[in-house]
Every structure is written in structure tokens, then in C-alpha cells.
């Protein structure tokens, strides 16, 4: 009977079976992964907005001697010259530095006389589940640009002793008719995602005493008037710190791992390469979460073209791009317990099995997708296997079950070879996403191997 069972458990030597990173990595590599993620957690706590990410990247690169190009404080490219001339193409790893959040409206402050609190009006950014954002401790990050052009930097709610902010919710005793019987995506509306910012009234004969007190406080502490909010970019983000998760500390829970997991790993990768064969570029772009619209995004090719011309004024930029190869460094969804029926499990990614290679994204019949060529998929697969980097192949959910996109399609339109490659993340687009330390480290190794290839 035992012999018979052994025979049944055997698989063809030609069968594909993805391997756990915990089994592929040596004990020393697992230790390196854990050590690597200590820096990653600090990055997540430091860079919760796109501007903060660029500031962090710039400060790190200044110490290395690498070239860095910055566009409007929201987009950057780090360059390491290669042995081959730029005319023969470049190697690019591109990630996005924005994450879903609550943005303040241009005229945000108001006083609610029924509840006697003051609030900021918000407009959510990116694809969120609105119910995630109520009763979540929030910090306020961003800048206010005054009429004289001077900038005031906000970062309130992150440090010990700082106040935090929150979107209030209704108690379950009274929520039945207005929330409980509604669809999940209708119970909390976008207009209700206003954050409480104060309740102490000013002394004196004012029509809105709480609002008046807060405007006075903001002017005294920051020198801002209400009109200054019109030229501000203020973002309410989760005040949570990145933390180890699980008894074994194998996971990381944090806000913004989509896509700062790829931002940090690609930054570290380009900082750690010495003399690549081809010129290596780590690209960091904004506004991917809202379709890459704007002048600091992957859709705008002017910045990339200007960089190529600065590297070599004599090249034909279009020809360089035709010869270039790209990794679109973005996360994929990890199979989620209790919701496995939305995934086609043979073609889904799981935590702890390494970096995820996605040949295509999009939705339905592969609409709005970059579909990487079989030749390029084979090239990346060979690179990962050669360097013994744990990886898995996956797409986002079952066919016709939804879908998503990345910046891959924008760079492929320039004639480049592009494929999506990034770590799996659970609870994506929530205020507290989950990733595996070995997957984060696998992404770093993959980007480093690619940039050196």
C-alpha cells in the first residue's frame, strides 16, 4: 500500500511546479531577507507620499555618485552608465510612488454645527474600498504653497505626541437603515469621508467659533490662511507604522506597499550594481493609481527622452527605445484566505513564493493590457532561473472577474520590451497591506540581476 501511494504521488519530470522561496533560499539568504526588510520598513514609514519618496530617493542617491534626474519633485530617474553605448539600448525598472489615499479638497475646512466639530472635506484618490478609511487613524502629509511661492511642509500624525485625524462612523445601534441594508460599496459615500480636525471653540462673537479657532491656530503655527489651501497638496494617509506580522515575523504589514515595495527594491538594486553591461535606469513615476494622467507620469515620454539625450546627445532617441528592455515593477494580488474563489489558483500568486511575473494585465479580453512577447518572457524566466531567484507566474484573478493595469502599456507603446514583475501583496489598496519578506527580497534580487544583465 505504501509503495502504491508513493507511485501516485510521483509527478512527471517535465511538470512545472512553483517553489517556495523559503525552500529555495539558504539559511543565510533568509537572514539577508529579514535584514533587508528592516530598511524597507523604515522607508515605508518615511515616504508615505510621492514627494516624500522622491526626497528619500534623492538623499540616498546623493551619497552614491549615481546620476539622478528629478521632474517637479514627483518623478525621478536614477542612472548608472553601462559598458555598452546608450545607442544600443538601456535597461529600465519602473515603479510608481503614489498610493491610494484621501486628498483634501481645495476649500476643505468647515464647521458642523449639529455635532460641534470641525472637519476637512476630502476627495479620495485611487481605487479604494471606502469603508476601509473610516475610524482609521490618519496623518496629514503634503505641502501648502503660499501666494509668494514659499512652501510649507506638513507632516502631522506620525511622531510620538502628534495628534491624529479620523473619519467618524455611525454606531451599529443606529446604522441599520442608513448602512447595514445597503450594498458594501454604497454604505459609505465619497462625500462622507471627511476627517475630524478639531472641536475647541474660539472665545468671542464669531459665527463659526470652532472653524475660527482652527484658522487662528493654523496661521500661528504654519502662517497659512484659508485661501492658501487652494494651492496645497495635502494627503490624509494611515498613521500606522510598518510592522512585522505573525509569530514568526515572516510578513510585513504597512500602508503603501503598492507600489513602494517595488520603489525600495529597485532603488536598492540600482544602488548596489557596479558596472552594468547596458546603461541602467531606475524610474520612479507618479499618479499610476489614477491612470498615469499628468506631467509626472509614465504616459509623459518627454522626461525619459530628455534623459536619453543628456546621456548621449548624438543618439536617435526612438532607436534607443526600440532596443531597450523594461521591467514594470508593480505588485500583484496574493491569493487571499476566505476569498480564494475569485482566483484561478493555477495562475495566481501566493505569499512566500517569490517575485511574480505577469505576462499581461488588463481586464476582460486583455483590454488595456501590455501582453509581453513569449521571447521576452523566456528571457526573464531564464534570467531568474540562472540567478536562482524564486519566482512565480500569475495573472490578476479569474477571467471576467475584474482586472487591473500597470504602467507597462505606456512604455511598450514606445517600442520597448516590457513585462510586469513584482512581489505579491495581500489586502491591496487597503490602509494596511501585507507582504512576505522573502518576496520583497526576491524582487530586489530580480531587479538587480536584470539591471546588471
Model-found features: residue ranges?
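N-terminal hydrophobic/helix-forming segments and targeting peptides
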Residues: 1-453
Amino acid at each position: 500500500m505504501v509503495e502504491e501511494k508513493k507511485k501516485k504521488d510521483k509527478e512527471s519530470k517535465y511538470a512545472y511546479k512553483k517553489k517556495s522561496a523559503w525552500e529555495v533560499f539558504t539559511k543565510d539568504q533568509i537572514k539577508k531577507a529579514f535584514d533587508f526588510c528592516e530598511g524597507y520598513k523604515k522607508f515605508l514609514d518615511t515616504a508615505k507620499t510621492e514627494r516624500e519618496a522622491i526626497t528619500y530617493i534623492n538623499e540616498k542617491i546623493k551619497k552614491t555618485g549615481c546620476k539622478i534626474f528629478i521632474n517637479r519633485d514627483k518623478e525621478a530617474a536614477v542612472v548608472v552608465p553601462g559598458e555598452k553605448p546608450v545607442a544600443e539600448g538601456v535597461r529600465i525598472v519602473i515603479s510608481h510612488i503614489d498610493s491610494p489615499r484621501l486628498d483634501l479638497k481645495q476649500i476643505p475646512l468647515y464647521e458642523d454645527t449639529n455635532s460641534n466639530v470641525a472637519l476637512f472635506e476630502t476627495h479620495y484618490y485611487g481605487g479604494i474600498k471606502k469603508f476601509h478609511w473610516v475610524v482609521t487613524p490618519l496623518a496629514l502629509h503634503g505641502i501648502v504653497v503660499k501666494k509668494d511661492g514659499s512652501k510649507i511642509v506638513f507632516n502631522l500624525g506620525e511622531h510620538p505626541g502628534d495628534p491624529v485625524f479620523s473619519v467618524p462612523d455611525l454606531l451599529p445601534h443606529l446604522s441599520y437603515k442608513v448602512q447595514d441594508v445597503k450594498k458594501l460599496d454604497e454604505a459609505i459615500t465619497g462625500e462622507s469621508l471627511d476627517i475630524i480636525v478639531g472641536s475647541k471653540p474660539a472665545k468671542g462673537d464669531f459665527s463659526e467659533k470652532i472653524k475660527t479657532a482652527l484658522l487662528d491656530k493654523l496661521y500661528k503655527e504654519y502662517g497659512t490662511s484659508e485661501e492658501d489651501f487652494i494651492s496645497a497638496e495635502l494627503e490624509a494617509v494611515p498613521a500606522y507604522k510598518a510592522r512585522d506580522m505573525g509569530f514568526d515575523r515572516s510578513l510585513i504589514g504597512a500602508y503603501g506597499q503598492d507600489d513602494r515595495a517595488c520603489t525600495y527594491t529597485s532603488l536598492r538594486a540600482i544602488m548596489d550594481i557596479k558596472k552594468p553591461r547596458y546603461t541602467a535606469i531606475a524610474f520612479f513615476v507618479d499618479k499610476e493609481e489614477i491612470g498615469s494622467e499628468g506631467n509626472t507620469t509614465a504616459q509623459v515620454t518627454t522626461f525619459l527622452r530628455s534623459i536619453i539625450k543628456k546621456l548621449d546627445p548624438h543618439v536617435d532617441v526612438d532607436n534607443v527605445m526600440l532596443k531597450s528592455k523594461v521591467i514594470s515593477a508593480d505588485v500583484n494580488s496574493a491569493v487571499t484566505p476566505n476569498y480564494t474563489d475569485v482566483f484561478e489558483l493555477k495562475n495566481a500568486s501566493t505569499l512566500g513564493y517569490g517575485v511574480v511575473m505577469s505576462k499581461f494585465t488588463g481586464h476582460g479580453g486583455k483590454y488595456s493590457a501590455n501582453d509581453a512577447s513569449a521571447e521576452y518572457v523566456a528571457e526573464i524566466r531564464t534570467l531568474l532561473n540562472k540567478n536562482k531567484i524564486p519566482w512565480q507566474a500569475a495573472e490578476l484573478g479569474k477571467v471576467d472577474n475584474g482586472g487591473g493595469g500597470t504602467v507597462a502599456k505606456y512604455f511598450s507603446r514606445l517600442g520597448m520590451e516590457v513585462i510586469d514583475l513584482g512581489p505579491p501583496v495581500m489586502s491591496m489598496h487597503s490602509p494596511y497591506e501585507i507582504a512576505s519578506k522573502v518576496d520583497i527580497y526576491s524582487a530586489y534580487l530580480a531587479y538587480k540581476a536584470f539591471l546588471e544583465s
